[in-house]
């Protein structure tokens, strides 16, 4: 059985109004193709901020896959979804595919200044 490793940024720091705000992710997640992957990102009162998620494949620039907690940019498959509540934001990949193997990074910013 094949496994899809999803490597995660251990810490992510954001600029602007939440400079030095620390986000913590688990080191890695592995799932079988077709299964659901849930990748978490934790930070103090993260639910009061907007969370976004980037996917980065080797040798490529990061691609935004989720913004404002749960919105998908044009061209991002519906299998990518996001949520954010309390101290945890979650990126969910339903029905993972081999092409989803990548690094995933979370980022946060103050929702009161994001408009």
From Swiss-Prot:
Keywords: Adaptive immunity, Cell membrane, Disulfide bond, Immunity, Immunoglobulin, Immunoglobulin domain, Membrane, Secreted, Signal. One of its GO terms (cellular component) is immunoglobulin complex. Residues 68-70 are annotated as: Complementarity-determining-2. Coiled coil: none annotated. Its main location: secreted. Residues 21-115 form the Ig-like domain. Residues 51-67 are annotated as: Framework-2. One of its GO terms (molecular function) is antigen binding. Residues 71-106 are annotated as: Framework-3. GO terms for biological process: adaptive immune response; immune response. It comes from the Eukaryota. V region of the variable domain of immunoglobulin light chains that participates in the antigen recognition. Immunoglobulins, also known as antibodies, are membrane-bound or secreted glycoproteins produced by B lymphocytes. In the recognition phase of humoral immunity, the membrane-bound immunoglobulins serve as receptors which, upon binding of a specific antigen, trigger the clonal expansion and differentiation of B lymphocytes into immunoglobulins-secreting plasma cells. Immunoglobulins are composed of two identical heavy chains and two identical light chains; disulfide-linked. This is Immunoglobulin lambda variable 3-1. It comes from Homo sapiens.
